[in-house]
Amino acid sequence: FLFATMIVASGKFKTNSACLLAGFFLTQSFVSLHELMLYGDQFRYAVLESSPNWFFIGSLAYALDGPLLYLYVVSLIRPNFSLQMKHRWHLIPVVSYLVFLTFAFYGQDAMIKRNIIENYLFDLEWQFVCMDTLVKSSRLFYLAMSIYLINKYREQLKESRSSIENIDLNWLKILVTGFAVVALIGVVLSVSKVIGLFYPVQVEFLIFLGLTTYYTNIIFVCFLLFLFSN
């Protein structure tokens, strides 16, 4: 949240670019909060006592951050970029995921929702783990497309012998590649859960992947905050 505020207030970016990048970092706040709700020993039960409906709201960020970062990259390399109605197709992942959550979780009665949370059924039942894998995979796809656009733009600059102007491609490549690594670990974790539906998977391995994803994400955001402020 702090990073998102700094980006908008800094004036270093065009309005569209600033809003897209700030939105991306805001989603990272919701991702961290979501994971804390699901697995934080004390916090999850405090939230559950308040209302089970708080759960999974933050998980929508997994379906939003990929499109936001992709559009941010597009806004930088295409000077005349502006958000238009045609970009609404990038909302398909988050809308699809919201529809799924409505039927699989929010539409259930309170007792079923509590059972899902208390017994970690979101990690054990096929519909949850398969949808989680799809969402995480779409996220990784957007990040891969972002890397492709950056590399393509760099090659175009070399061929035309143009200057990079105001675009810091090194910062951009670090940003996108770093989060692509985080997203890849997340996909490996999700796929491991799917495999666990059919074959035994060591719980310690899943915990290791989960903690690696969570802390790598936090450390990388702090690293970017340091780079941005210098």
Model-assigned labels for residue ranges:
Residues F1-F13, L143-A144:
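First transmembrane helix
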Residues V8-L21, S75-H87, E155-L169:
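Membrane-interface helix-boundary motifs at transmembrane edges
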Residues A18-V31, F43-L76, H87-T102, D132-K136:
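Individual alpha-helical transmembrane segments in multi-pass integral membrane proteins
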Residues F30-F55, I112-I116, L189-Q202:
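Helix-loop junctions on the outward
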Residues H34-L38, S96-Q108, M145-S146, V182-K193:
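C-terminal TM-helix exit segments that contain a strictly Trp-centered aromatic cap at the helix terminus
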Residues I77-F103, W126-V129, I164-A180:
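The cytoplasmic-loop to transmembrane-helix boundary for the fourth helix
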Residues F103-A110, R114-Y148, L206-T213:
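Extracellular-loop-to-transmembrane junctions of the mid-late helices
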Residues F226-N230:
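Membrane-proximal linker segments that couple transmembrane helices to downstream signaling/catalytic modules
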